[in-house]
Amino acid sequence: QTKSAWLQKLSSLDHEDDDPGTVWNKEARDRDKDRMSPRQAWRAIQAGMPEDVIISSDIGNNCAIGNAYPTFEKGRKYLAPGLFGPCGYGFPSILGAKIGCPDTPVIGFAGDGAFGISMNEMSSCAREEWPAISMVIFRNYQWGAEKRNTTLWFDNNFIGTELDPELSYAKVANACGLKGVTVK
């Protein structure tokens, strides 16, 4: 398949289909009709990223989707967590990239589960001498990869995979002296 055909197909997707025998993606779409999907968000972000940006993503379902979207024809760099599953990798890696390349724009991506592991770094990067970064947190209010496994292997019976929908990472960022923004 040519790159052009692949990009056209990718651009036409606006949500995730459920695995056979599960309906929780559909339930989330029906429940939260006013929210954009990760695919819609990734397309919007991709359109606004500088050509020379350093990108980092964490592990998890949201970033697995997003890994298909960034393009690298113009010198962008990508910091990948690899196959070791280092949950919480995205935020610290983008901080390190910005410290190492202070004049280069950086943007990190993580799901809410993975970001929760490293969000304490917000208290460090708010220091006046640290250069600014951008970090995007995708909220699906769950440990998505784990929830997917439990729904597939245990007849849609899951426990301990839901995250608090009332927690605002934007408010946590603001409390750390950073600028936090929520986009739906």
Segments (PLM) and residue ranges:
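Thiamine diphosphate
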Residues: 1-9, 64-184
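Flexible, glycine/charged-enriched surface loops at secondary-structure junctions
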Residues: 6, 10-22
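Active-site diphosphate/adenylate-binding microenvironment
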Residues: 18-103
